[in-house]
Amino acid sequence: MSRIDDLLKHMTLEEKIAMLAGADLWHSVANQRLNIPQFKVTDGPNGARGAWGGMATPSVCTPVGIALGATWNPEVVEKVGNVLADELEAKGAHILLAPTVNIHRTPIAGRNFECYSEDPFLSGMIASAYIKGIQDKGKGACIKHFVANDQEFERFSISSEVDERTLREIYLEPFRIAIRNSDPWAVMSAYNRVNGAYACENDHTLNDILKGEWGYKGIVMSDWFGTYDKGVPSGGLDLEMPGQARWMSEEMVKRALDDGPLTEEILDDKVRRLLGVLEKAGLFGKPELNPEGGEDKPQHRKIMREAAREAIVLLKNDGTLPLKKVKSIAVIGPYAAQAQILGGGSSSVTPHYAVSPFEGIKNRAGKKIKVDTAPGCHIYKSLPAPAPETLSTEDGRVGLSLSLFNGTEFGGAPMYTEVTPRVNQGWFDKSVPNVNQESFSLRMEGFFTPKESGVHTLALSAVGWCKMYLNDEVVIDHSSDADMGKQLVAEVELKGGKPYPIKVEYYWKGSPRWRSVGIGHQPPQPLDLMGEAVKLARKSDVAVVIASLNGEWESEGFDRVDMKLPGEQDELIRRVVKANKNTIVVVNVGSAVEMPWIDKVPAVLQLWYDGQEQGNALADILFGDENPSGKLPTTFPVRLEDNPAYINYPGENGKVRYGEGLFVGYRYYDKKKVEPLFPFGHGLSYTDFKYSNFKLSAKSITPKDKLTVKVDVTNTGKVTGKEIVQLYVRDVQSTFARPEKELKAFAKVEVKPGKTKTAAFTLDREAFWYFDAAKNAWNIEPGGFEILVGASSRDIRLNGAITLEPEPRAARFHTGLTVGTLLDHPESRAVLSRHIGGFLLMADMNSAVGMTLEQVASNHPNFVPQKLLAQIEQELAQIK
């Protein structure tokens, strides 16, 4: 008997039920009597964060999801997964709540930066590598959010109204691919509803498809607080998070057992899955969970830099890049000198370090090239934290002294102390050890030493009550309930280089929820911020403008309102390029943005939120130390109105209709002949590649066969480069609506100057199938198909044709034959007459005779339902 079977045999009903919800925010429930340990989860996907907010230990910060998608390189992504497994070990955790594989349905969705692509195949393959990298090292991944969680607007309640074929081919497909390839330990259900039923208890998606059709054996956990009613225990969910139990409580589960449809057999299956995670993690017989920590390892830095480089996409280049023979560089933009490497929300981590574009460029330039910076404009909605080097403790350490006390009076010995440069603190649930979550106080104190003299703006924000003191005088009083959640500011005249005593006292009283306190600062500003940047650009050989979004504009919890760069960044770019024709725009965002200045600038790089090595990776590309090799994993439309979801987004009356159906991203732009700003798969190089010698292993295949496709890629330039060869399939003769082409394979090949590499692909039946909703099955329609290879979805270099023959059947007669063929033979004609004679008499026989009986059934399900079709198939098979 296995360990799991033995434990199930000895567990009481109450002990089984207790496992179905978390113990707290991050842990499963342990069972002391049976020595069942607990596992720990932590947020991702941009790192393994550990505890929330200011108490978080430092972590590796990876490039965000869309950046990993832009690498088109599963090998590199797998290495990133290996690093994240190490980080999980350092955090004492076992499962990373990642990857996020929702689809880029609209370019303004708040969490697009977390997700890989608009294409389900690319998403699934990148997710497979990410999961494999984590799980090969004995840790687990939790793929999310299952399913159709593609916007933040009304995300806790909106119903994604999506037809079955689109659900299968687009939104479920990345999950199916990743589960088939890498078998993640866990799947996280989404907050939203899918066709009316909440995703956390959706019988069709969780039980019928995930656990039934796909045979998934891992656990299904809820998103945090993402359970809603009494249907949860029987709806396919295994673990309600976080604890304490609400809908998976002993009372609710016992009621579901009494009333049905929950059975003890289903309950045992849930517990078996949870015990299976503990076994995979090797936790039985292990000591207590490790405390959280973090280690900044050289090999991790190397992998982060490699991934960051491979993610950068060269969108446009009129010969300006790579930089050569320059003596001065102006690095301009609101985040030129500050590393903006994350969107907002639960994916955020506290990085060990972060290299800004200015820092990376300056370090690479050395002493012979003068590098200066200017912001040009600001885009923050709230003042950012003071620079760490301006904060110090009494003994000279960087940061402020932080102390936490029980009660609201700052009395007695502190329960927790540390010195931290992180002056934006946040707490959620039970993140702070030994502190009364319903009544505590905090003090941050030390010295603030401004870099320059003049009028400085200090800021204080809080969910709670607090005051800021400077020189022992209150400068900001944030103790009014009316100011809860707001940032209050005060202007003070300060002398540069002089240390000023600063103190913030904060307290909380009430039920535990999200609580926070943060300090902001803005130094004296020039009267003409943009003018200063333009002057710098004019006197420099090259201007590099870092155009950005940030976590205030692009975040979990809300969608963007448009595709525009916030603030005055478009105007800044126009003025800088007018002052210096050698202007390079570097777009530091997590999704598509409008670029009204695109025709005016000679070079554009897509940087993304590129992780802790952002600045170094950018410098590698700018100076030509590395050749850009990223390609867009999502289409950049010219304007928001061009995107296929525009008409139906955000929805109304609690529903959002996925009216574009299959035609998401490039599938839509191809079908409607709409010219995008930059197409899916686009990305330039510092060299050129020639495609040749296109070969197909056969001209005719059956669905059981595999097709080998080969193409030679020659580097015709002067530097080594990597090309992403993209293979698309087009159904030439489909009865059903099909996209113009669909990505079915890709390969990233590195080729030296003058050399040739062969990219080889193997296609199986999945490259040709579509989902037939009438049959509730994947189907392959015989006929002509085109195999296309190219450098992007709009840059097809070579193509070839194949014929897909019908799958051989043992029976002489079957429903895959045309109606005309079946009517030509007396025995088969008798079967048709007996079952659908009336329909055939009234049908348009000119069109019907050329269709297979299966196609007739699909087109006319009311007259030829699937049950009847199966009966006809059975009778036809009996004809000798």
Feature names for model-found ranges:
Residues M1-T457, S461-W769, F785-L788, S793:
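Glycoside hydrolase catalytic-domain context in secreted enzymes
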Residues D764-E807:
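Terminal connector regions
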